[in-house]
Amino acid sequence: MHIAVVGLSHRTAPVEIRERLSIPEQSMEMSLKTLRGNDQVLEASILSTCNRLEIYTLVRHPELGVGAVNEFLSNHSGLQTGELSPHLFNFHHQDAVDHLLRVAAGLDSLVLGEGQILSQVKKMMRLGQEHKSLGPILNRLLTQAVTTGKKVRSETNLGTGAVSISSAAVELAQLKLGQSRGVDDLVSLESEQIAVVGAGRMSRLLLQHLQAKGASGVVLVNRTVETAERLANDFPDLSVECRPLTDLNTFLSTSSLVFTSTAAEDPIIDASRLKPLNRRSQLRLIDIGVPRNVAADAATVDGVESHDVDDLEEVVARNQEARQAIAREAEHLLQDEAQQFLDWWDSLEAVPTINQLRSSMETIRTEELQKALSRMGPDFSARERKVVEALSKGIINKILHTPVTKLRASQARSERQQALRAVERLFDLDPS
């Protein structure tokens, strides 16, 4: 068996490719079922965010297993394997383990050390458990990843002051506004007419950062006004007006700055919607949705400036240099955590031998116990029989405890294999 991960991220694929492979939560059960339906895939888990899609699997054969995942991705996205392959990465065994731990720690994120990715890894594990696509190996690996993500943030300063996708989007707006005024710095949003489209987790974070950056008011646009109102109630110090998505054109006409973050699978803003508005002032669209909420042709409309998640690099670069030293400290911690999992994984090769050894001892115990009990005759009470049986089990468990513990103990793989072969020869075992 082999652990493998196949995926793409902001490092390997532009947003127009990433959005083709994005898997919404409502499609996760079927996607996991499809993967597990392949004979090569024993366990599977999917991480789908705005900046990455990664499929972690336990497979029978590395090449055939990766081939099965590639076929799934091609079918899901409608892209030929040749179109996808330049954007995909795949890692096996220790490299796959190292990669997942780096992801959970925020070391592979666009925004170094961002905290949201850990919640997304937890969600990946929860969905895998709910849809029964996880087995003991990936369940243990994901648990180790979550533990590692927490440990990195508690034992280093990596999470302190880290920007998020949402905060980077707000800073990008400030930066672009400043540049339009001839200032290469972040400017206040106090005088801007701002709209936020969507009322999910990312929109909540947008409202937090808009409030912190001086926004005086925000129009919150959502399909369901009640959902928007519940979110707005959490920001009593920010003036938030909630409106239905059917009023979107009104706010595209009057706003100077519009953030979009919805779960829509197709763009909700494009050139055909913007052109008839006849705007007289600049409109900046900042889209952090994946799939994108704003079509690429929106930027062709006069007076419209459009940005997506890939444009956040400009802001992120301003914040990263000071965090690199902390990241190096976190990398050392990750090495220890990865080794813990790999030691556990290596110890699993002892399980078949241990199970057969226990089975062999149990057979001997029951046979000898029956011989002894038959010699005791009918005067031997049921209670006395139970005492003798418990005694026989206790003796076997005591005898096996030390050798079983040593076979499972962390040690060089060659030493463990040598010990296993010795036990198999001594007790005439055949764990295969």
From Swiss-Prot:
Annotated binding of substrate, by residue: 49-52, 109, 114-116, 120
Active site per database record: 50
The protein's Enzyme Commission number: 1.2.1.70
Coiled-coil intervals: none
The keyword Translocase is assigned to this record: no
One Gene Ontology term from the biological process aspect of the record: chlorophyll biosynthetic process
Pfam families: GlutR_dimer (PF00745), GlutR_N (PF05201), Shikimate_DH (PF01488)
Keyword Transmembrane helix: no
Gene3D superfamilies linked: Glutamyl-tRNA reductase, N-terminal domain, NAD(P)-binding Rossmann-like Domain
Family membership: Belongs to the glutamyl-tRNA reductase family.
The protein, known as: Glutamyl-tRNA reductase
Species: Synechococcus sp. (strain CC9902)
